[in-house]
From Swiss-Prot:
Belongs to the phosphoglycerate mutase family. BPG-dependent PGAM subfamily. Catalyzes the interconversion of 2-phosphoglycerate and 3-phosphoglycerate. It catalyses: (2R)-2-phosphoglycerate = (2R)-3-phosphoglycerate. The keyword Isomerase applies. One of its GO terms (biological process) is glycolytic process. This is 2,3-bisphosphoglycerate-dependent phosphoglycerate mutase. Its EC number is 5.4.2.11. Gene3D superfamilies: Phosphoglycerate mutase-like (3.40.50.1240). It comes from Parabacteroides distasonis (strain ATCC 8503 / DSM 20701 / CIP 104284 / JCM 5825 / NCTC 11152). It holds the Pfam family His_Phos_1. Pathway: Carbohydrate degradation; glycolysis; pyruvate from D-glyceraldehyde 3-phosphate: step 3/5. Keywords: Gluconeogenesis, Glycolysis, Isomerase.
Length: 248
């Protein structure tokens, strides 16, 4: 049996402030660091020994991965970073408070911006300083590939080539792989793996720093998937994520 563990980063500063984050490079909160270490403890207790790990270019995912591997005493394993694992780009919404935005535009519109499959928020302007083309970490990425906004469909189209060509083939020579990334980038992978419809993916809520295990047979066919942890606690965490974009 082979496995890939998907892990959303721990709570970030803008998660705590209920802001749209996207490609903004915000740090983890103290709670987020503790969540990451807790995930590391859980994975260690379950006996996971990872052959390789993947993460994004954003520090909240990178630090989550570092905390997990540190707690597991597996800091030495090879790690590959890719911008393709970054969070969905929220365009002009980045930095705005989700509840305040819902008060202004309504819960339904914010849900569409957050979770619809093919509708993107209004894009950043070309000269907006938040445009990724001004960020040195993306200097080797062609400008035409760098988003100024994204729908989940756009995010999936960005991620899947990397999943299919880089991450998943690693299972041919590895038994266990860890991917530490973001809510929407991971939802794109999960949608693909479980063949979830465009309509149903709107209702998938991933809690922070809860390992989601996907098990494959020797022919690399998916045979099982499950969260690690207490089911009731995980359910409450999912509900909290679902409520982030609602009016208070």
């Amino acid at each position: 049996m082979k496995s890939i563990v998907l892990l959303r980063h721990g709570e970030s500063i803008w998660n705590k402030e209920n802001r749209f984050t996207g490609w903004t490079d915000v740090d983890l909160t103290e709670k987020g660091v503790a969540e990451a270490y807790r995930a590391g403890n859980l994975l260690k207790e379950k006996g996971y020994v990872f052959n390789k790990a993947y993460t994004s270019y954003l520090k909240r995912a990178v630090k989550t991965l570092n905390c997990v591997l540190d707690r597991m005493d597996q800091d030495w394993i090879p790690v590959e970073k890719s911008w393709r694992l970054n969070e969905k780009h929220y365009g002009s919404l980045q930095g705005l408070n989700k509840s305040e935005t819902a008060q202004k535009y309504g819960d339904e519109q914010v849900l569409i911006w957050r979770r619809s499959y093919d509708i993107a928020p209004l894009p950043l302007s070309e000269d907006d300083p938040r445009n990724p083309r001004f960020d040195i970490r993306y200097k080797d990425v062609p400008d035409k590939e760098l988003p100024r906004t994204e729908s989940l469909k756009d995010t999936v189209e960005r991620i899947l080539p990397y999943w299919k060509e880089v991450i998943f083939p690693t299972l041919r020579t590895a038994d266990q792989i860890l991917v530490a990334a973001h809510g929407n980038s991971l939802r794109g992978i999960i949608k693909y793996l479980k063949n979830i419809s465009d309509e149903e993916i709107v209702h998938l809520n991933l809690p922070t720093a809860v390992p989601y295990v996907f098990e494959f047979d020797d022919d690399l066919k998916l045979v099982n998937d499950y969260f690690l942890g207490d089911p009731e606690e995980i359910k409450k965490l999912m509900e909290a994520v679902a409520n982030q974009g609602k009016k208070k």
